Amino acid sequence: MEREKSKFEVTMESNSSLQRFVKNKLAMSGLVFIFLMVLVSVFGSLLRLDKTENANDQKLSLALCKPGFSVNYVSKKFEENEWIPISKSEAIGDSIRVELFEKNGGGETVIFALSDLKKDSKGEVVSQKKFWLGTDKYGRDVLSRLMAGASVSLLVGTIAVLISLLLGVTLGLWAGYFKGWVDAVISYFIQVVWAIPTLLLVMAICFAFGTGFWKVFVAVGLTMWVEVARITRGQVLGIREKEYIEAAKAIGNSSSRIIFRHVLPNVLSPIIVMSAANFASAILMEAGLSFLGLGAQIPTPSWGNMIRESYSYLTTDMAYLAFLPGVCIMLLVLSFMMVGNGLRDALDVREN
């Protein structure tokens, strides 16, 4: 007679799965990169050069500067995150005369009172900024935009996966456990949604509800639940016939108790693996929508938006402006795929 595993057996299997996952170097490499991206997303506003909201501080005089470019600047008091790039400065008594920065020289000369300017940690009114990855066509720091874009990608992945789990697991559990007309209705609905191309469905939802930061995230999530529901249903159909499920029914346990206490814990492994894959798909989908102008809207930083703004430079020496966000998308998606493969191997999803 097949019985339900004891808590001790479950704990031992969990420890064994964790050990297998930790030994997987590719999976751990992906997990480390994801962890770094999470840190950048959470603490990015403190770390990046451009500390404005959305990293959208535009300085047209600094447009399309090369990586490693440095510029001196002065900042006025009582004007947060406001700074003025300069090329020359000269102290004149209680004032300072500066030449505003222009890439071709010949900037306007302006005189400021020293009492109106902020001082840095060294007590100097003239400071320096370094743009490690250069600036875009609006004079914004590329590195700051990339760091800010990481939070958008991780947020869309998180929201989309949560929505897909909420819908997919719920419908899959109902269809697999209750069978009959419930299974027939839900399966028919799944097949209808499954037949519609994902990108086309997302675009239809965006057109119906409008573009926007949160609307796009919800739209992506509403298109990713189908596969979760199919996998959950298939797993539940097998588990519901186990003898320990029949025993739970015989002693009078309610359907909800059986589903959440005995069925759901036994279908989590493939759902976890699917969630990692869905996370990667959501990031790719959001980037594609942003590139098409249907995703996160300007000035919200998005790697897809950055590629859209800079793809015209692909045949010039500024091609890195489109290449860098593309690399970020590739690395983050690859990391989630490696973690997903590691979870699949560690949890023995294929064998089970």
Positions of PLM-derived features:
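Gly/Trp-centered helix-boundary motif
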Residues: 1-165, 169, 313-314, 318-334, ...
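Alpha-helical transmembrane segments of integral membrane proteins
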Residues: 135-352
